[in-house]
Amino acid sequence: PEGAGIWLRLHPEDVIASPYTSWTFDENTERMPEFSAPGIGKRSTKVVIDMEVKDNTSGVLFAMGGDGGGVTCFMENGKLFFEYNMLIIERYFSTEGQKIPAGKHTVELLTAIPKPGGPGTVTITLDGKPYSVCEIKRAVPAAFTASETFDVGKDLGGSVSMRYHEKAPYKFDGKINSVKVDLIKNK
């Protein structure tokens, strides 16, 4: 029926979602459909990345979605960044943190999105210490896209971020040991 395409925007509770609440990925994860992947960028989540970097490491740690909307966590010249592409309408960026020294590190991204389509905050820590923050004015209520995917260690398809669009798929040149994602139940 006419207008049926806006149903999920008005009723995000009807979105098809994975039954899982916890995932563990490695750098071989690619092209996982959004509706099967964790709800990163749409729900409250905790993402823990176990990685090894060299001086000036660059590349995508993970990306969900594409140029039409999505989220990405990436490194550029040794610094860590997070970007939230709200369907091209708005883009939200993390504050810039310090250069990360060579070695093994743990990055945690704690995303608080209390309700679909509402505002949110992504708090990023490095080895247990505050690193940067991304304030989201409006989160995507249902889905970023029906055709893009979740990737670890690269951003296949359309690039979530214009910062690395010309370098796509912007393969991570460090080592990703694991990316653990847990959904957080909102109160």
Task: Indicate residue ranges for each PLM-predicted region.
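Extracellular glycan-associated modules
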Residues: 1-187
